[in-house]
Amino acid sequence: MKTDELHPQPLPFRIRKIGHVVLRARDLQRFVAFYTQVLGFRVSDTYPEAMVPGGMVFMRCNADHHGIALVGGMPAPSAGGELHHLAFEVDTLDEVFHARRRLREQGVAITFEGRRRAGAQIAVEFQDPDGHQLEIYWGLDQLGDEEAARPSGEWRWAHTLEEALVNPPPGQTPRLSDPALLEAGKDARP
């Protein structure tokens, strides 16, 4: 695919951020427990089975009514059309380190941590109870309307959060407000 094919004509509206995601869950209560107890979401509303087969729970992590909704009664995984991953942005790099610590404390396996190449975000990735890949990140490159993405020669892959701090790409200044988080991460390595 050519790069110019990726830039469609201007539209009369602009998508700003992911508003919400709806996931189907085999065990709705297990999902609610994961998103509330591990990730800190709060339940905003629920639909009983009489309204939606399997029930439905709406949850939030900010002032929006819901950022994620879960529908119960999911059958065995289907082929095709599955969600690849869902990413949650945080305001500070410290929060990514805090998230990693929290995930470890909750016994959640981390599938990736460090810096991704394209986008340069520093992230921790893991799965929810049904295997949906989730990401908590900070520092995603910001691009103006006419600005090109970072050239691949500036990408700085990092396989740990600590490595991401010492090998930043041009223009990214990853600093922890709380340096103790760096030592805590080393102590908690599996």
Where do the language-model regions lie?
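Core segments of cupin and vicinal oxygen chelate
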Residues: 13, 24-67, 188
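Short beta-strand/turn micro-motifs at beta-sheet edges
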Residues: 7-10, 71-76
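A short beta-turn/loop motif at secondary-structure boundaries
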Residues: 49-52, 76-77, 115-119
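Catalytic cores of nucleotide-enabled group-transfer and carboxylate-activating enzymes in metabolic
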Residues: 34, 44, 88-91, 98-100, ...
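Conserved beta-strand in the GNAT
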Residues: 68-71, 135
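Histidine-centered active-site/metal-ligand motif
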Residues: 20, 66-68, 84-85, 116-118
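Vicinal oxygen chelate
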Residues: 1-11, 17-26, 77-102, 106-190
